Amino acid sequence: STRVRSSAASDVYKRQACAGGALMDLGVYNVSYVVGLFGSPNKVHYAANITRGIDTSGVLTMEYRSFKAVSINAKDSSSPARYIIQGTKGYLLQKSTANFCGGVTFHPYKGKEEHFNLSAGRPRQAAEFHAFARAIESEDMELCSRMLDTSVAVSRVLETARRDAGIRFTTDL
């Protein structure tokens, strides 16, 4: 990506000891997106392009009971961000990164497309910060618990995926 190439510390991601591969650095956003929407997958597979023990890019497949979710993470190339969720009645298209859900368009197989944008004109993380503030103010421990459960689920997917690809960290037992 441009970010990696232009970084003064661009060699850091290439060192295995830094554990800075594409999956753990960039894939966390994609996995959080998918797990946040659909929960934990039943099976995980990561096909990685590995250079010097670090994945510079890869394809992550998360299998659910009735569908599969596929995510591509890359530090060795770049392309426009696209998120597509396909269903039996049409598909949703998001043309922004996973960590910023901007506009989403529903493209039905029959009928007129619909566009949704709940963050139009607001700072990128405004909705997230407002949700955090509401949870803190109302002491919503149930929400906090669900968010922690999601974080643990995301970590498990990432850990399973990297081990599946044979990526080992110096801290692994």
Predicted segments, located by residue:
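Single conserved hydrophobic/aromatic residue that forms the stacking wall/gate
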Residues: 1-13
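Short, conserved glycine- and acidic-residue-centered signature motifs
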Residues: 5, 27, 125
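Contiguous beta-strand/loop segments that form the cofactor/metal-binding neighborhood of enzyme cores
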Residues: 30-103, 119, 130-138, 172
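Active-site loop of classical SDR/Rossmann-like NAD(P)-dependent oxidoreductases
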Residues: 117-130, 146
